[in-house]
Regions:
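Conserved beta-strand elements of the Class I
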Residues: 5-7
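Conserved SAM/SAH-binding beta-strand->alpha-helix loop
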Residues: 34
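Class I S-adenosyl-L-methionine
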Residues: 63-73, 83-166
Length: 166
C-alpha cells in the first residue's frame, strides 16, 4: 500500500491521525486551536511534535501559513467543531460561529490542493451537506458523504458519524 502524506485540521487529541499513522501513513501537519488537545497529541506523537501546531484555522488561512505543502499532500482531513450541530447539544445553537469553521477548512483545501479530502462530523452537519459538496465541487473535487455507525467499525461508541469524502 502506498504511504499517504496527510494533514489533520481540527485534529483534537489525534484520533484520525492515530488511525492513519497506525496504518503506516505520514503525518505532515496537525492543527488545532485547543492547547490541551495539542499537548495530548504531542505526547502521543513525540517524533512529530514540531509539526503539531496550536493555531486558529481562521488565522492560518488569512495569514496564508503552511502553504509550502501545496501540491505535496495526498489527504487533508479533519473534524470541524461540532457543538452547534450536535444533537447532544440541547441548545443546538444553529448560530454558533464555530458552525462556519468548515468553510475555512475548505479554503485551506483549495490552497493546498490535496488529492483527497475527508471530513468527519456529527450527523447534524447534514444541514450543511449541500454547501460542503458544492464548495468541494467548485474547487475540482467529486464529493459525497455517508452516514456511518461507529460501532460497526470497532469503535466502542454507539453513535452515528457523517463522513464527506472526495
Amino acid at each position: 500500500m502506498k504511504k499517504i502524506n496527510f494533514i489533520d485540521i481540527f485534529c483534537g487529541a489525534g484520533g484520525l491521525s492515530y488511525s492513519f499513522k497506525k496504518k503506516g501513513h505520514s503525518l505532515k501537519l496537525a492543527i488545532d486551536i485547543d492547547s490541551s488537545s495539542i499537548k495530548t497529541l504531542k505526547k502521543n506523537f513525540p517524533s512529530f511534535k514540531d509539526n503539531i501546531i496550536n493555531e486558529d484555522i481562521v488565522k492560518l488561512v488569512k495569514q496564508k501559513k503552511y502553504l509550502n505543502f501545496k501540491n505535496k499532500i495526498d489527504l487533508i482531513m479533519g473534524g470541524p467543531p461540532c457543538q452547534g450541530f450536535s444533537t447532544a447539544n440541547r441548545q443546538n445553537i444553529l448560530n454558533d460561529p464555530r458552525n462556519e469553521l468548515y468553510k475555512f477548512f475548505l479554503e485551506y483545501v483549495k490552497k493546498i490542493k490535496p488529492k483527497y479530502v475527508l471530513i468527519e462530523n456529527v450527523i447534524g452537519i447534514r444541514t450543511k451537506a449541500d454547501d460542503i459538496i458544492k464548495n468541494l465541487s467548485n474547487i475540482g473535487y467529486v464529493a459525497d458523504f455517508r452516514l456511518i455507525q461507529a460501532s460497526d467499525y470497532g469503535i466502542p461508541q454507539n453513535r452515528k458519524r457523517i463522513f464527506f469524502f472526495c
